[in-house]
Structure formats: C-alpha cells, structure tokens
C-alpha cells in the first residue's frame, strides 16, 4: 500500500506529488500528470481514492493504464452543479471499477447514473473505525492544556467551503455571525482552519 499526497495537508504519506499549481487548471493537470507517472513507475494492483477532492482526478491516469479503480464515499450528491466537488464525484463514480457507497441513499444515486449493481457496494462509513482506532490517543491528549481550553467551554468550528470563503458577502456574513456567537456565549472558538480560510482571515483582518 502506497499513500500518496498531492498537496493537501496530511500527516501520513509515502509519496508526495507537488501538484499545487498557480491556478486550478494547472493543479488539476499536475495531479493527472504526476499520478500517471507514479502509476507507470510503481505498477499498482489498484488505485483507491476517497471522497471528491481534486486529488481524485488521479483516476483518469489509472483508467488509461487499465488499473482497477476503487472509489470510497461514492454516490454522494448535493445537487449543486456550482460546487467543484459535484463534478469530481460524477467523473470518479462513472469511471471507477468498484464504487463503495456509504449508504443505501448514495447507492441509489449511482443506480440513477446507470451504474450496474455489480460495480456498487454499500460499505457504510469508516468513521466508527477511525474513532475507535484513535480513541486511546484522544483520551490522553493534552490539547486542552496546550490551548488553554476548558472542556465543554469552547466552540469547535469547521468552515472552509469555497462558496463560504471565497465569496466576500458570504465570508463576512459567516464570520460576523461566528463572532456574535462567541460574544453571546462568552466562549473561545477553536477553528480547524484550511489554508484558504487562514489566508482570507488574515487578509480581511478578522
């Protein structure tokens, strides 16, 4: 098993493909090019991709090389064609050899796309296994002490979607509301921050 990273933040990786380009077109092209070269070099028995990020576009090279493709989190849909993830999902679902849907609902979306049932399996979400495998480390973590936080007395925030961060109106509306919430409940906010969000916050002065 070889875990590959194309540019997002991840602590476990065997190969790093510096695929981040100057713009979206360059990044997507780099992902396909770098992964294709890696597949030629390593000759994998299969390629497993998770989710709907741009890194999933690596399957295009795998398909051309006749390498079996396995897609975890297949079949998810939000029915919003403006979201880049929706395009990625459709591409990867269609060309994957095996689609692993987390729910029966997602499986039905795959069936609606015309995918044969022998290429689709409902596996359930791996979240329970992820939590169980990391529970011991979570329980002894000193993160509250390091960040000077009191258990149950802070707000955990995750907000990184492109339409919320890159659209100025949505961005200011979102973080004005977040600041108001912090003031109302008199709690600090712990923000698990994507690089795009961090840069936007620094530039805006929030």
Which stretches of residues belong to each language-model region?
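Donor-nucleotide binding loops and adjacent catalytic segments primarily
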Residues: 6-8, 138-206
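Phosphate- and divalent-cation-binding pockets in alpha/beta enzyme and binding domains
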Residues: 57-58, 109, 130, 199-201
């Amino acid at each position: 098993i070889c875990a590959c990273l194309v540019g997002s933040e991840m602590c476990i990786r065997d190969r790093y493909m510096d695929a981040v380009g100057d713009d979206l077109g360059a990044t997507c092209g780099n992902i396909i090019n770098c992964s294709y070269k890696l597949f030629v070099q390593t000759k994998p028995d299969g390629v497993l991709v998770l989710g709907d990020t741009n890194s999933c576009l690596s399957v295009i090279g795998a398909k051309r090389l006749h390498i079996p493709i396995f897609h975890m989190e297949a079949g998810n849909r939000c029915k919003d064609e403006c979201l880049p993830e929706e395009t990625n999902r459709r591409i990867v679902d269609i060309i994957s050899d095996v689609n692993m849907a987390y729910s029966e609902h997602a499986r039905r979306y795959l069936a609606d796309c015309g995918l044969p049932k022998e290429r689709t399996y409902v596996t359930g979400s791996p979240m329970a296994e992820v939590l169980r495998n990391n529970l011991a480390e979570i329980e002894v973590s000193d993160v509250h002490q390091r960040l000077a936080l009191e258990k149950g007395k802070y707000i955990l925030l995750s907000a990184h979607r492109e339409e919320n961060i890159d659209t100025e109106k949505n961005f200011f509306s979102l973080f004005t509301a977040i600041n108001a919430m912090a003031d109302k409940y008199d709690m600090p906010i712990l923000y698990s921050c994507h690089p795009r969000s961090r840069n936007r916050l620094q530039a805006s002065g929030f």
